[in-house]
Amino acid sequence: MGQTIANVFYKQRADFLEEQKERDKRLKFPDDVEEIRDIPYLKDGLKAHHLDVYKSKIITPEQEHRKLPVIINVHGGGLILGNKEFNRYFCAKLCKLGYIVFSVEYRLVPDCMFYDQCEDLSRALDFINDNLSNCNIQFADIVTVL
């Protein structure tokens, strides 16, 4: 990939982050949703290898005795921009509908190739499966939102 194209991608990413900051000033995160941020799913120190967990602070009697269905949120952005924080209000809404939500960060083009992004997501799913079973989640009932 040429440097000119890479620079266009970096500019789009910077513009997106500025727009996200303005949007976040107008929105309020709900008090009844717990947000656990920046859990590393790989121990390599990259911010791109973290995930957030969203779960409702209010557990209904029905939910108390069953494992919660899971949504894995993978932010959009054409593989070149975006971040897991962009969808935090959406993830909170999903929690209110009875899901536990994992929002995954991954490396972006042009800093990596598409295959690397697939590997990031695969490693995040492995981490969730191996390490976060204490969240009362139902692994047989997983939906991925891209």
Task: Place the predicted regions along the sequence by residue.
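N-terminal cap/lid segment of alpha/beta-hydrolase-fold proteins
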Residues: 8-66, 118
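Cytosolic, low-complexity regulatory segments enriched in Ser/Pro/Gly with interspersed Lys/Arg
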Residues: 1-8
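Short beta-strand element of the alpha/beta-hydrolase
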Residues: 65-76
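A fold-wide structural signal in alpha/beta-hydrolase
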Residues: 70, 95-102, 107
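Short beta-strand immediately N-terminal to the catalytic nucleophile in serine-hydrolase-like folds
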Residues: 144-146
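Catalytic nucleophile-loop/oxyanion-hole region of alpha/beta-hydrolase
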Residues: 82-90, 102-141
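Feature marks short, surface-exposed loop/turn motifs that line or immediately flank catalytic pockets
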Residues: 57, 78, 108-110
